[in-house]
Amino acid sequence: FLVDINKVELREKENPVNTISIYEMRDVVDGYAFNYSLQEKNIPNLISNGEETLIKISELVVLDPAGMAEKYKLSLEELKNKTDFDLMVDQTAFNDRIQKGMLPTIDIQGHTFYVDIRMDMLRPKDDFLSKGIVFDEIDHYFSEEANAYIIPYNPKTREFQELDYDSILVFPKDLIAVQFPFQRDLDPIGWNRNGGWNIKEDLKRIGLKSHFEAKTIPWKETFLPQIITENLMVLKEKTIKKKLQNKSVSFSKKEQGSKGRKM
């Protein structure tokens, strides 16, 4: 297997499409470990039934020091005594989170929110009247396609605000659509603590940041146009049905009146 520093994986020399991601391996002292299928020459899946063996490899700084030095713009001398974790995880952000207890922040329409995993919310800074954005309330707004939340947001109250999807006919004027990452990506350390896992779990894969910027998404680029179109069609059908009913009632009354005069 070749060590691909840029893709963070092992690639079989004779079969380049066969790769093993470092992120799929377990972190152990001085390296990584994984179960290896001798038949598939890869990490076994759920239906594998061939012979397996436990493999342990050194860290990437040991396997390819020159490649790691080039990737992280360090000299080989500067690379000495550093671990994969030192290079792959922002150490300033890590120390701010662990040593100083600083919560990550995210900017939403010019206002700063704290990513508070313990309270299960994005908590607005210096705004005690706002209840902020509670993750449990926006669970159904997570987009698998975007791999992020896309929610209706009220910039005045600085809160998530649910829409009435059964009756909405136009884009809301006082609300905007904002997009931001899943809470594990916003604060992986807080996520690990809350789940009872090692605080360094998945940090090399996810990365670590102290601040994020939420994106504002035009309503026309969300799922809302489809819902509005469907509601307008339903409204049109109801209107037509009502007109037909009124016409039928009117005709019936006219017919009854005509019969009365004949009598």
What are these regions (language model features)?
Residues 2-5, 77-136:
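Long, contiguous regulatory modules within eukaryotic nuclear regulatory proteins
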Residues 22-62, 136-240:
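Polybasic, proline/glycine-rich intrinsically disordered low-complexity segments
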